[in-house]
């Protein structure tokens, strides 16, 4: 036992070089690559089986996509053509109506320019003459009536005074006559003139009656004004134009475009003539066969290379162990030689006593091993595990009663099993078991989810979702397409109205502002010159006939152009397109509406069943693969457990050798 140590010696270390991390990693990579190859091979086989078993479904789906696409494109195209033609006819009719409006406006403007001007001037002359005559007679009547009344009053006053004087003279003459004659006979002249009353009362009743204006006002009332003349002319001219517009509005655009039933719609194909899968079955088999061969060759080559590297990695590891052991032994020898000078003291019996620099308990027989100290210092977990194992084996004994040799044996076995390489194997094994447990949990959850979701009895199952998702997806895509297309149409319409008709709007607004300014300036000038005179109304009427009425017509025309100079592009209604497709499907004479729906439903059911079986088959395959990985992890853990009997065998051999020595 004198040569037995509690730590691993060079031979012990070299016995574990095949457990180095490089070899183990390469071996694990080889196994993982092998499992991966098997997984790929199995997935390829599943894919091959699935494709070959669903050739009819694939052919049917491909046929529906390729053969029936013209049918639905034809329906949508015919609908768009119909709506486009209808909107074109409506736009043409609207254009004709605008042309009629413009023509009527031009005719009215021409009539107003030539005939209207003269008619307006004639009416204005009559109205102006009557107005001047009326104003003149009113002034004259007022002047005459006021003057005659004043003169009559003044004459009455003068005549009254003269009458009083004459009466006084008559009275005096009568008295003189009576004095001289004394005759009371009243037959003479003086008796006949009692008094004199001079008056002009009849002159008070002299006046010019106001009824003299009635004839003039009656003439003015009977004379038509320009507005009446203009309205009468416009009404006569608008008769044919209104008739044309009425006929245009009565036109039905839907009747003009003709019978849309003559538009051809490609029929729905009922057969699966486009057999993209069944017609290429031999090529599919050959392709999968080539894939399998390539996979096998690549797997063999890679595994061979990995094995060579794994074996080759042992040589540098062994060489490193030898060099490390030599350094450790050199360190120990150097320490043993140097301790005589640094760490010795002489007792009374001239025996050497070792000064332990790590403050360890005194070692019997005066032996101190620096490698043991190194292991205790730098491999603390090994030392702790060794202490736990010693306490477990010697349960119930105090540390002082434990045999040092037994303790050394336990520490050596623990050191052998907890070496860096052995712990690496243990860690890999435990990690592999943990990964396998996680994989089993995931597989169980996936199986439960697949079995629960891919059932036809579940109302929220994938099968029902697939049945309803087609229509929903078409409707959503149609709505999205119509919205995006309408956005494009809105942008285009705005750009056209701004870029093409923008200058028209700017011009019409500028012309209207100019016309309004001109009319305001003309009215201001007339008011400044003729306001308060008899010529103001006639001049205003003449200027209105000759200039302002034309300006108002131009302003009205510019406003009409401003309102009409805009492009309105019809929008796309996704709901109408969907209704047209549904109507076409209802009116179709081809018996594919119900049969296609039933076939599609059966096809979806078959696809769901195949999908469920395929997924479960793949999960079962990965379950088997996970079992294989768990087996490998358990084998790795067993390799670590094998280190215990190996350590016991080595320990027994050394003990026997020490006994023989």
Swiss-Prot record:
From the record, give the transmembrane residue ranges: 17-37, 106-126, 297-317, 425-445, 630-650
Task: Note the topology in the membrane.
Answer: Multi-pass membrane protein
Q: According to the record, what induces this protein's expression?
A: By pheromones during mating, through the regulation by the STE12 transcription factor. Also induced in respiratory-deficient cells.
InterPro entries cross-referenced by the UniProt entry:
PRM1
Q: Does the keyword S-adenosyl-L-methionine apply?
A: no
What ranges are annotated Cytoplasmic (topological domains)? 38-105, 318-424, 651-661
In Gene Ontology terms, what is a biological process of this protein? plasma membrane fusion involved in cytogamy
Keywords from the UniProt entry: Cell membrane, Conjugation, Glycoprotein, Membrane, Transmembrane, Transmembrane helix
Mostly located where?
membrane
Q: Which residues lie on this side of the membrane: Extracellular?
A: 1-16, 127-296, 446-629
Recorded GO CC terms:
mating projection tip; plasma membrane
Entry-listed glycosylation sites: 135, 145, 188, 197, 231, 252, 272, 280, 490, 505, 512, 531, 573, 587
Subcellular location(s) of the protein? Cell membrane
What's this protein's family per the entry?
Belongs to the PRM1 family.
Which PANTHER family does UniProt cross-reference here?
PLASMA MEMBRANE FUSION PROTEIN PRM1
What this protein is reported to do is described as: Involved in cell fusion during mating by stabilizing the plasma membrane fusion event.
Name this polypeptide is given:
Plasma membrane fusion protein PRM1
Natural source organism: Saccharomyces cerevisiae (strain YJM789)
The record lists the lineage as: Eukaryota, Fungi, Dikarya, Ascomycota, Saccharomycotina
